[in-house]
């Protein structure tokens, strides 16, 4: 074979190799560096005066209802659906309502389900989602400060003559910063209605302070012991919310993993469920103290 032939063959082989290389896909890009892990967003912190304004609409709730409201507010995303369900079933009470909750297999947190007998409270929370989320965030991040704010507002209402024992609840003063509001009958809870602009300010001359707080009908909670109503209280001096004698300990840090301290037992026997799914106008359940 001549030298010319060999050179020509080499050139052809080189051209073929270059063509193959040109048609080959480019190598994949290098993997990106591992994402940097950032700490969770810091908890929003409120000043005492802001906390006073935040809790004023619920500060005079009796302790058991206040405890359920504060813990339920930390699940603010569940409140609208719970309020809608409670409104649709507001014709049920006691064991009938408890049975409906079980039969509908509701997936709310127990603290939210504990408020289902109180459609007016849930409606107030659902109608003001910004307030509810702010309250829940404060409870998660600043529970001691939230409880102190409640005590400051209760002290104001006492000083101005609005908060005192009556037929619905007993006001018990255990010491500074320890004002308890307890139902007269533990099986029934009365929701107080009041205007914060009135009860937390000095009364006007000639104003009858006894008209500053009114009450709706008593709500029977005996059928809702599984949802914490059998034993819920505050340790005001230790800044604890106690459910079934165990501290409720959900915080801003563990809010994604915390499990309620009690489990819901099997449904208690009761009568047949009444079906009458009639949605009532939401305005019927607006708390009076929310209308300023």
Question: What is the predicted function of each stretch?
Answer:
Residues 1-11:
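Bacterial N-terminal signal peptides that target proteins for export
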Residues 70, 74-178:
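Mature extracellular/secreted ectodomains of secretory-pathway proteins
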């Amino acid at each position: 074979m001549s030298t010319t032939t060999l050179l020509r063959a080499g050139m052809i082989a080189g051209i073929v190799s270059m063509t193959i290389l040109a048609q080959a896909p480019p190598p994949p890009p290098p993997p990106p560096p591992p994402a940097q892990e950032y700490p969770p967003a810091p908890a929003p912190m409120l000043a005492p005066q802001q906390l006073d304004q935040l809790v004023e609409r619920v500060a005079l709730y009796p302790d058991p209802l206040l405890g359920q409201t504060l813990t339920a507010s930390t699940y603010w995303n569940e409140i609208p659906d719970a309020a809608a369900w409670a409104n649709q079933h507001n014709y049920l009470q006691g064991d009938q309502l408890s049975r409906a909750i079980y039969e509908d297999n509701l997936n709310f947190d127990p603290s939210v389900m504990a408020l289902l007998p109180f459609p007016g409270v849930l409606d107030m929370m659902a109608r003001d989602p910004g307030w509810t989320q702010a309250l829940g965030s404060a409870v998660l991040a600043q529970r001691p400060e939230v409880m102190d704010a409640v005590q400051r507002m209760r002290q104001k209402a006492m000083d101005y003559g609005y908060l005192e024992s009556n037929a619905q609840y007993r006001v018990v003063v255990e010491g500074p910063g320890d004002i308890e509001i307890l139902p007269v009958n533990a099986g029934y809870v009365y929701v107080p209605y009041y205007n914060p602009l009135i009860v937390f300010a000095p009364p006007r001359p000639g104003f009858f302070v006894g008209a500053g707080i009114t009450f709706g009908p008593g709500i029977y909670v005996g059928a809702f012991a599984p949802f914490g109503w059998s034993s819920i209280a505050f340790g005001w001096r230790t800044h604890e919310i106690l459910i079934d004698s165990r501290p409720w300990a959900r915080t801003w840090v563990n809010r994604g993993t915390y499990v309620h301290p009690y489990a819901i037992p099997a449904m208690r026997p009761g009568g047949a469920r009444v079906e009458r799914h009639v949605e009532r106008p939401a305005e019927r359940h607006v708390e009076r103290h929310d209308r300023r």
